[in-house]
Amino acid sequence: MEVLMAERADLVFHNKVIDATAMKRLISRLIDHFGMAYTSHILDQVKTLGFQQATATSISLGIDDLLTIPSKGWLVQDAEQQSLILEKHHHYGNVHAVEKLRQSIEIWYATSEYLRQEMHPNFRMTDPSNPVHIMSFSGARGNASQVHQLVGMRGLMSDPQGQMIDLPIQSNLREGLSLTEYIISCYGARKGVVDTAVRTSDAGYLTRRLVEVVQHIVVRRTDCGTIRGISVSPRNGMTEKILIQTLIGRVLADDIYMGLRCIATRNQDIGIGLVNRFITFRAQSIYIRTPFICRSTSWICRLCYGRSPTHGDLVELGEAVGIIAGQSIGEPGTQLTLRTFHTGGVFTGGTAEHVRAPSNGKIKFNECLVHPTRTRHGHPAFLCYIDLYVTIESQDIIHNVNIPPKSFLLVQNDQYVESEQVIAEIRAGTSTFNFKERVRKHIYSDSEGEMHWSTDVYHAPEYRYGNVHLLPKTSHLWILSGGPCRSSIVPFSLHKDQDQMNVHSLSVERRYISDLSVTNDRVRHKLFSSDPSGKKKERILDYSGPDRIVSNGHWNFLYPAILHENSDLLAKRRRNRFIIPFQYDQEREKELMPRSGISIEIPINGILRRDTILAYFDDPRYRRSSSGITKYGTIEVDSIVKKEDLIEYRGAKEFRPKYQMKVDRFFFIPEEVHILPGSSPIMVRNNSIIGVDTRIALNTRSRVGGLVRVERKKKKIELKIFSGDIHFPGETDKISRHSGILIPPGTGKKNSKESKKWKNWIYVQRITPTKKKYFVSVRPVVTYEIADGINLGTLFPQDLLQERDNVQLRVVNYILYGNGKPIRGIYHTSIQLVRTCLVLNWDQDRNGSIEEVHASFVEVGTNDLIRDFIRIDLVKSPISYIGKRDDTTGSGLIPDNESDRTNINTFYSKTRIQSLTQHQGTIRTFLNRNKECQSFLILSSSDCSRIGPFNGSKSHKVTKESIKEDPMIPIRNSLGPLGTVPKIANFYSSYYLITHNQILLNKYLLLDNLKQTFQVLKYYLMDENGRIYNPNLHSNIIFNPFDLNWCFLRHDYCEETSTIISLGQFICENVCISKYGPHIKSGQVLIVHVDSLVIRSAKPHLATPGATVHGHYGEILSEGDTLVTFIYEKSRSGDITQGLPKVEQVLEVRSIDSISMNLEKRIEGWNEHITRILGIPWGFLIGAELTIAQSRISLVNKIQKVYRSQGVQIHNRHIEIIVRQITSKVLVSEDGMSNVFSPGELIGLLRAERTGRALEEGICYRAILLGITRASLNTQSFISEASFQETARVLAKAALRGRIDWLKGLKENVVLGGMIPVGTGFKGLVHRSRQHNNIPLEIKKKNLFEGEMRDILFHHRELLSSCIPKNFHDTSEQSFTGFNDS
């Protein structure tokens, strides 16, 4: 007090404008200087003055006082312009939906924020005495956000879930809202208005529960004698402000020395002077007392509580600090909930900071330290991992700019930047406390069409048969327009008169694979190719001018390589690999190969794992042409999908089982199915019976007779016709109500009048047209027996299969459809019921370490005869040949930009490559960006023979000779269209387009002699990596004429454009392909004429890494199917509507987020470790102590974090008192139990300690976290519990147990009408506390114990460091730092 008296002379003199916060500071300083009474007198005068002035000024608020900010018009216009550009990019396929949403939110958020910052200076300049300005900025009424909505713009709103609506409200409330804007703003504000009532009641209930937990805590003693403390240290990154907040008003638990000099003693309370001294002396760690370490659970002592926040002195005896604490935490809740109401659901988000260039100049940085990436808006950028120094050289000075780690660099090296240009973007710090959540966003296709993607897409290996694909890097998905050929009559046709059209398709789960050969029948040569159906098939080549030929390879193999005839590949036996020959021509008849061709499945990366299906073929015996249902009858089926194959990919389980057969019989029940559009009229009724060739719909007739079932689904009608007989059963017949039963041949109907035996299997199904009547349809069944599989010897040479150390094959039969699955046949196609698969296997013992084998596809040409081989290597390293730059092999044509890289090729050995050097050939290198290896596509002079055996064709030989004469022509000729990846300079970066290749073979090989161009369109697809692969068969797709765009080019097209356009290439919108300017629609080049192109329109969708692609390559998607699922993190709006439930979750100890582990789990782990190390009595005690300390600190941090993020300051000690009550119980466990407590009983920790010491026998217990509700129901007083919840239950239990209520708390006394033991009523306890003076001895004993305890905790670090992540001491320090990271 002497100090205060001395300072009374120095009166505080203020001469400045005071707002609300300054007023608070002033009042607290006044209290410090003059005490309570004097201050209240001063404040009274201020109040009177204020009212006088307000009356004199008489501020009124009219609508004219709301002045809109002048710069608003062009700011909004600018933002709209940016949104428009963004929309365009999304349309072109440069950014995807999530990036677009994210960027548009940030554009509008930034605009809105900018307007908000303009508001204050604008008012200050134009109209400083504006009532809105005065009220808002003095803190009297209305905050910046509300005024901003009145005079700025409302901006982005959030919907009731706290998600963003990406349509901003551009007008403010002064200008008035349009109808749309009004609806959007009401949509989000409902949360604010309606929920306010609910939320207020929530906050009230929270307060009630909090007070319930701590109402009995009263200051009852000056010092409890504890010698523990929690250390706070200024070292670890605490700001001074936070340190001061933490320390002021606490009491020291230990003396503090500076060297040998003691600067503060134990039990001294910390004032601002002392804190400053600590900061100047840089005291290492300061032990303070907190409610956590007070010795009793039912009261608290003055020193552990510290100063009372009201009058800056140690708290008085008899103060009800518990209730104060409950109210301090609950009350801001009510304020905070109201806050949503004030801003009406306006969204707040975070924007990133920018680094701008200090002056004009050239920018330079070290490119090794950065890594190219996409920003979250889809712009290309560099990511720097460590601090990056960027130099900007202008004419005379060099500026250095430091860019912090994890930032995005938005410029390229050596680029010229202008002053104030944004060169880097710093990630928005995590200091903004926004709750992140992971969101799935599905992108749906907006048109019908065929899906195409780059080879980048890979399966998760577990999903060989599923449709979950992951994208490892950014690429496009294209939806090529055109619908599948359905069973309706095609109203238009693309084919010219007399074209030959050959459509054959087979259906494998909605993939309509078919082949389309379209030509004019003038000049024809036949080509043979193996087809899935195994029929020899004509491919027709056309010499007669620029007409369209679509001819396809069939396999998805890597890099078909053409080797010269000297190569030694034909040897069939090699160790560790085997080679399967395919016959292209008549030789097939000589070998006993079954009619149905073998289809080989090799993944695109060429790597096969054990038990992968290598090849399959479809036995024609198990092919049906009509729809129907498969049933297994008595078969045991072993579904191949085992438990471990099913991996949950981000929550979605998807796989497609194939069923492996154990027994050799299954049944097929045919039915006819028609799928009609929803609008079409149907000529027959449901459950009616029709004959063959009845007219069902306008142009559809039934092929079989029978019972009709009509089912209406979304947008279409499914009409089924069941063939077979119909029986009306008598009353005695019991027919199962199930979907249907199979009856074996030879069984008749018992007890019925007509006894009829069936010769074959039948399927009986009960049909109920009305409730009472029903009849039975008996349908014929086709029975299939399954053979034991084909003899492998007929497929492959015998010696191949007998090798021991080789790759082996097993034959497995799969049924393709599940039991009872309906099978739909598409128009005129056949359905394969059983597929025979060859499964790879190899010897585990010998090659135990080998997980995967590499397959390659090799094509060998010998004198017009072409053989294809698959080679499967068990060899570990795929790299078998390295060619250096000066090597003779490399002296072919390697493009300049890639010539200095080492060419590593995966499929050739050295000897084999050498044979190529005798003939001059072109080597075209494709850089494979994923792996650091390159692959060759070699066009040697034997290239032309690849076209196939042209029987006696002259032009063929001419071509070969002319190539030999002038080796440069084929190079020039084929390098143009073959494998060029045009870089399209797009709006702000270059995207690689997906290209297809054509090989142009000119008859006389002269460019200007265009009339006689001989075109073979070999249909390749090239992906964004420059890898080439064959697509699968061309689908049976009918184009709509409107989907094709004709694009006319100049006649000089061949010289200029042939490098840009190749057949099958995908062209994004807005790309220049001719002199006339950009192309209008995006699409795929379908037909190339000399002077024009036909482009099939396609829609690109961009997808980034980590996205999931649904569906299969080449699958036909209908409108509205899901294409891609993006998973992205977004911050929920930082509304306290999310904040209050968070506080409540922490206090009720529910698990909050999946990321931070639930504290309870952590607690259990700790308990086990420590008990194991220290043995029983100490182990339980210390285990419980440490766990409790840990969880207490982290709970306090979590609660503070939520409140701080809302700008609400609550003193830590209030939260501590409450947390102490939640964590002060332990749960008695069973083992080693003495008879004192029953297992599962909750007792206080201190009580457990004392009982354990008294009994000198360990009680086993573990720490437990109670929520506030449970804590309220587990107090010492049953009257208080009964008045809280579940009155009857609590009272009945108390009566049964014979509980005694000592009436220590406030509530019990209030209920019974006694005097409450706080404040003046506290005197009743004074004589008790006097008795404590004569117990120094007991305290000393306790101190002995406490000393040992403290030793164990703080000094024996070696002992604990093995089981405690950080020792106790540090954890508390660090977590106190954590308290204050708001």
From Swiss-Prot:
The keyword Metal-binding applies. Zn(2+) binds at residues 224, 294, 301, 304. It holds the Pfam family RNA_pol_Rpb1_4. Its cofactor is Zn(2+). Keywords: Chloroplast, DNA-directed RNA polymerase, Metal-binding, Nucleotidyltransferase, Plastid, Transcription, Transferase, Zinc. Transmembrane segments: none annotated. GO terms for molecular function: DNA binding; DNA-directed RNA polymerase activity; zinc ion binding. Binds 1 Zn(2+) ion per subunit. It catalyses: RNA(n) + a ribonucleoside 5'-triphosphate = RNA(n+1) + diphosphate. One of its GO terms (cellular component) is mitochondrion. One of its GO terms (biological process) is DNA-templated transcription. Signal peptide: none annotated. InterPro entries: DNA-dir_RpoC2_beta_pp, RNA_pol_beta''_euk, RNA_pol_Rpb1_3_sf, RNA_pol_Rpb1_4, RNA_pol_Rpb1_5, Rpb1_funnel_sf. CDD domains: RNAP_beta'_C. Its main location: plastid. The keyword Transport does not apply. It is found in: Plastid, Chloroplast. Its EC number is 2.7.7.6. Belongs to the RNA polymerase beta' chain family. RpoC2 subfamily. DNA-dependent RNA polymerase catalyzes the transcription of DNA into RNA using the four ribonucleoside triphosphates as substrates. In plastids the minimal PEP RNA polymerase catalytic core is composed of four subunits: alpha, beta, beta', and beta''. When a (nuclear-encoded) sigma factor is associated with the core the holoenzyme is formed, which can initiate transcription. This is DNA-directed RNA polymerase subunit beta''.
